[in-house]
């Protein structure tokens, strides 16, 4: 379980419950089909509002159509959806810039360059944006870095550790 989402869920739960409401939280385990099924289930349970962090920015669109048809307002966080017009509101960071700042920092700290292994999660738009920002920054830095591999870590630290170990 991602510590970011554990903290975020706790904060949302605290606010929701302080108003006498109930928060139902589901983990799609980085599976877009599971997430769509979970949203269908929430609609059938009669939820009044939906907080959405898509596994796949475009893969979630059918579920957003269902939410829209059901008249359920949608609030996005952290990762944008493929069509932001579905959302009532969105709160998230500038993931591209966050990656760019990391790339700039690496170039300053490792001025001789080196080999880099990128562990990403291509279906997660927030991760893709951070990766692109990072790669653009190191390219523009003038420092020579070689991307020797790029693997899908599926947004999972254990998978990332295993892939890094295998590739090293």
Segments (PLM) and residue ranges:
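A residue-level marker of the well-folded mature domains of exported/periplasmic proteins
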Residues: 1-168
